[in-house]
């Protein structure tokens, strides 16, 4: 089987990671003790992608939990599925990273990283044929961002030919823990551009807006935001966990989704949007799902796809429905909105259907878009970064851990380059002979 090793780092990474395991364990019929109580062979057919089978027929997540302080991991251990995880796979320090990227990447995190790599090695060795790694983390803090990106580069060194996927939570002033989030996020993106194959950008701004506007929650909690994240992660990984033809492993997903190696930041979406506890009471139709799925309000990244163009798209429909209708609706969307899909990648929308719907829904749709509009998210962080960096505000916390200002400047320009690359391909047409001479024409 093609196995995936899952790593969760930092407070946010551990919280969304724990939710992810709750949701997929439920979908595969695995209870908190690791015992299977399912009702369909489909649940077990590809169970080995995420679970090891232990003695006594128990299923154990192939998950590694990392943090620089014990708090969050204690709550995961005490949570509903806390006993499911392998006890040796909890690796934590005591000092904390204090929301400081440099502590996670260069000092505190660097001391713990070898312990983590030992467990990564052990998990990888027990795999039959490892396809790659997935990391859940946030970019705004210290551990998930700093140590998370350190882990990525170390794993990359040791497993250069395996796929590296991240679910990265991007900070937003609307749901902010710390004033230095733009620094931490920019330093992280600088790493992700170079060292990951696929990054799902989960944007706290978008999650907050969905909870507030669509779900009418006046004061969304992290629990509400994480409910959306776990639904999205479950949808995105459906093709990896259940039998099917399309995007059935991380590499095939990357091949379909990433036309240029640096442009691998995806905008996820989900339909129908439901709040925790109140699953939708009316069944949706395929046209409604399709329409909702492409709607800007359903995107988990606060970017408007109408401000850019799609390079590639993958859609995953779940539930019992007519394949013919799904294909018709997807073609319909593309024909009606063909201006929003680059014309120099024909057939750039791929669709998969899985029979097993998520709990509480008859059918759902998950959207993965590689849109040039994601540049809006990087621009937002870049502006916040520049505002502080030009005054050198808070820099002493980073230089005190041995960082150089130069590294900040490099990270800033790498992210700005990324924005211009997205812009360049947004404006490119089939006729353009050479992409190099951009800048001659402004956007209409």
Swiss-Prot record:
One of its GO terms (biological process) is microtubule-based process. Mg(2+) binds at residue 69. It holds the Pfam family Tubulin. Keywords: Cytoplasm, Cytoskeleton, GTP-binding, Magnesium, Metal-binding, Microtubule, Nucleotide-binding. GO terms for molecular function: GTP binding; GTPase activity; metal ion binding; structural constituent of cytoskeleton. InterPro entries: Beta-tubulin_BS, Beta_tubulin, Tub_FtsZ_C, Tubulin, Tubulin/FtsZ-like_C, Tubulin/FtsZ_2-layer-sand-dom, Tubulin/FtsZ_GTPase_sf, Tubulin_C. It is found in: Cytoplasm, Cytoskeleton. SUPFAM superfamilies: Tubulin C-terminal domain-like, Tubulin nucleotide-binding domain-like. GO terms for cellular component: cytoplasm; microtubule. Its cofactor is Mg(2+). The keyword GTP-binding applies. PANTHER family: TUBULIN. Dimer of alpha and beta chains. A typical microtubule is a hollow water-filled tube with an outer diameter of 25 nm and an inner diameter of 15 nM. Alpha-beta heterodimers associate head-to-tail to form protofilaments running lengthwise along the microtubule wall with the beta-tubulin subunit facing the microtubule plus end conferring a structural polarity. Microtubules usually have 13 protofilaments but different protofilament numbers can be found in some organisms and specialized cells. This is Tubulin beta chain. It comes from Trichuris trichiura (Whipworm).
